[in-house]
A protein has these predicted regions:
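A detector of single, family-specific signature residues
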Residues: 1-449
């Protein structure tokens, strides 16, 4: 007679009408509780009509919430159709939905997702609202266009180097006013270095004589052809970027349509120079009307970076209850791994989050400024190294951004000197406390002349 194994108490069910979807490129597998349908696992093709039929079936059997993995971009149409049908949709991080090793199939994955979601063991990944998602899509596409344009800048520079035209040595940027005038003249057929040097802009630091010497080249038809096509492709992508700027401006106008005018006028800009690859409209004013706070007053955050931050996070940061949760989502906080009471590792997690990369770049920039954040970066860089200092400074900038967006905090830089003074006072206070613990009293040394 075989032994009857005792039943193990299962986890409590929190979402009784939950479904799980295993997303694929050709078809999607949907699993629902067996109490809702005689066929709890069904497969639907990836066509729009089939996805709509999936939504109708889920609505018919009374499913209230659905979970799916963020598999590539295949989940996006499913998410949008189900959301428009009035079903709560959750996108889970694949790192948190790993199944035990063994038999793996699409059906098992869908049932595993449904079980985890029913027991409330999954967390929803952040996804902004429809209007913010549109703004984010435009900005990400714009960055991709700029990457394509940058590749053709390299092609132009390589073609110039083949012809021994040392333009990049006499101008700071070959896509500047002087550089583009000279390149367009070469493409148009001009070969006289004296005539080309006359295109020098008055703001160019190199003299006409130096530019003349750099433009004596060895012209070859194949390299001129490459230069011509690279210039045409660069102009093409720049035109697409301008079209993208129009869409971004319209998306911001939709977001600010129902926003009242700020009570206080916008603060004076810290920098008046236009940044490279900046958008072709007043981003700072539009963002100030949208959120009521001038993010550019935070050192390290310029108008375009502020726009990127808002596009990636949205305007409502209450989804992160504290600044610690926000920095953890950005993977800028320590990732402690503890076993047996011992800290095995405290390295921050690796992430492909775009915001994290932008904030790290901002931290490197602010480290060269005479500000409190710059002094903080330099103090840490000398003690623990530049890599960790970049992460810590990026986290500080992220906390300032969170407080400005969540609580309307207006940032005012105390300056590097005040920061160093407060740091000195804090260290002295710690020394006095440590000395008192050992029964000593610290006294300030008198200056001996």
């Amino acid at each position: 007679m075989s032994k009857v194994r005792p039943l193990i108490n299962s986890l409590p069910v929190i979402h009784e009408r939950a479904a799980g979807i295993d997303i694929g490129s050709r078809f999607h597998v949907v699993a629902v509780p067996s109490t809702l349908s005689d066929e709890p696992v069904q497969t639907f093709q990836a066509f729009t009509a089939d996805i709509q039929r999936m939504a109708d079936w889920l609505k018919t059997i009374g499913v209230e919430t659905v979970v799916m993995e963020s598999t590539g971009v295949y989940w996006v149409p499913v998410f949008e159709v189900l959301e428009s049908a009035g079903i709560g949709v959750m996108v889970a991080n694949a790192r948190e939905t790993r199944s035990v090793p063994g038999r793996k199939s699409d059906i098992n994955d869908a049932q595993w997702l449904q079980r985890l979601h029913a027991c409330g063991l999954l967390r929803a990944s952040f996804r902004p609202g429809r209007d913010i998602a549109a703004l984010r899509a435009y900005l990400r596409h714009r960055e991709r266009l700029l990457d394509y344009a940058a590749a053709h800048i390299q092609h132009m520079q390589k073609a110039l180097t083949f012809m021994n035209l040392q333009l990049h040595h006499v101008v700071q940027d070959i896509t500047g006013v002087t550089g583009m005038k000279i390149i367009r003249a070469i493409v148009a057929g001009e070969r006289d270095p004296q005539v080309l040097a006359e295109f020098r802009d008055v703001r160019c630091k190199s003299s006409i004589e130096i530019i003349h010497g750099a433009l004596v080249g060895n012209y070859q038809s194949e390299h001129v052809f490459v230069l011509t096509q690279s210039l045409a492709l660069y102009d093409f992508y720049q035109a697409r970027v301008d079209e993208c700027d129009v869409q971004i401006e319209q998306a911001l106008a939709v977001l600010t349509a129902d926003k009242p005018e700020p009570e206080q006028p916008i603060p004076k800009a810290r920098h008046r120079t236009k940044q490279p690859n900046a958008v072709n409209f007043d981003v700072r004013t539009a963002l100030y009307q949208l959120i009521g706070v001038d993010l550019t007053q935070i050192h390290g955050i310029g108008p375009f970076l502020a726009l990127r931050l808002v596009a990636e996070c949205g305007t409502d940061l209450s989804k992160w209850r504290t600044a610690k949760q926000f920095t953890s989502w950005l993977t800028l906080s320590p990732g402690c791994k503890i076993s047996g009471g011992k800290v095995l590792s405290a390295h921050s997690r690796k992430s492909s989050n775009r915001l994290t990369a932008h904030l790290r770049l901002a931290a490197v920039t602010v480290g060269r400024t005479n500000t409190a954040l710059g002094a903080f970066y330099r103090r840490l860089a000398a003690r623990i190294g530049k890599a960790k200092a970049v992460t810590a400074t990026a986290r500080k900038i992220a906390v300032l951004f969170y407080n400005a967006m969540r609580f309307g905090m207006h940032y005012s830089d105390p300056g590097a000197e005040q920061y160093e003074q407060k740091y000195r006072e804090r260290v002295i206070k710690q020394l006095h406390r440590r000395a008192a613990e050992f029964g000593f009293i610290l006294q300030e040394a008198e200056c001996v002349s």
